[in-house]
């Protein structure tokens, strides 16, 4: 009903039309008609008459683009346009969070982490996500055989851990594996000792392998 009523308004180059398109977008968004929501918000943005309405329309366009699972390039452009135009917006942290989630879904962990690192005061959930991303970057580096990068990312996980956590514990183990492959046996032993000292070590599935690795490192040093 709201959509039918809004459609009756003749669109012109004025603030009433801009507001109409914004609310059409809201109505379509509630109906999960994301393509029509995007078009309505895009029209409101194009009018560019009321600065506050434009900001709200751009933010909601970002949301609709994200929810629509649009092509990565289109989504990135929407995020970047908003961030560039409204760096101090009340919506900016939410935009960065959505941007990070988009990159996370596409497994672009570095870009996701970069997006979250721009948030001045990340909450606990964001901090946890950043730890996950650092750990995944360490794992990816390990798979690619980039042991120096493994150590770098594992150390960042450890340094940014406010308390014992799975990521911190496993980062010690991953760093030990990287040091071992670099034939750095004293560092391997040191990382494994820290790994084994963690309060949640009983939850780790790598404990048995760590003990073997510890013995091999002692033998080789």
Regions found by a protein language model. Give the residues of each.
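Acidic, polar-rich low-complexity tracts and alpha-helical solenoid repeat scaffolds
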Residues: 1-221
């Amino acid at each position: 009903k709201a959509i039918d009523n809004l459609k009756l308004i003749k669109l012109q180059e004025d603030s009433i039309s801009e507001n109409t398109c914004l609310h059409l977008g809201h109505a379509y968004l509630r109906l999960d008609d994301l393509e029509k929501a995007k078009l309505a918000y895009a029209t409101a943005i194009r009018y560019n008459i009321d600065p506050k309405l434009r900001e709200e329309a751009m933010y909601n366009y970002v949301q609709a683009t994200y929810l629509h699972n649009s092509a990565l390039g289109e989504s990135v452009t929407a995020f970047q346009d908003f961030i560039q135009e409204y760096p101090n917006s009340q919506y900016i942290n939410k935009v960065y969070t959505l941007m990070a989630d988009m990159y996370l879904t596409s497994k672009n962990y570095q870009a996701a982490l970069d997006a979250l690192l721009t948030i001045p005061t990340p909450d606990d959930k964001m901090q946890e996500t950043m730890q996950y991303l650092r750990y995944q970057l360490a794992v990816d580096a390990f798979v690619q055989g980039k042991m120096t990068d493994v150590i770098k990312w594992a150390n960042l996980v450890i340094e940014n851990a406010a308390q014992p956590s799975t990521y911190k514990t496993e980062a010690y183990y991953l760093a030990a594996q990287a040091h071992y492959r670099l034939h750095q046996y004293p560092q391997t032993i040191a990382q494994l000792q820290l790994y084994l000292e963690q309060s949640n070590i009983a939850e780790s599935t790598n404990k048995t392998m760590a003990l073997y690795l510890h013995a091999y490192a002692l033998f080789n040093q």
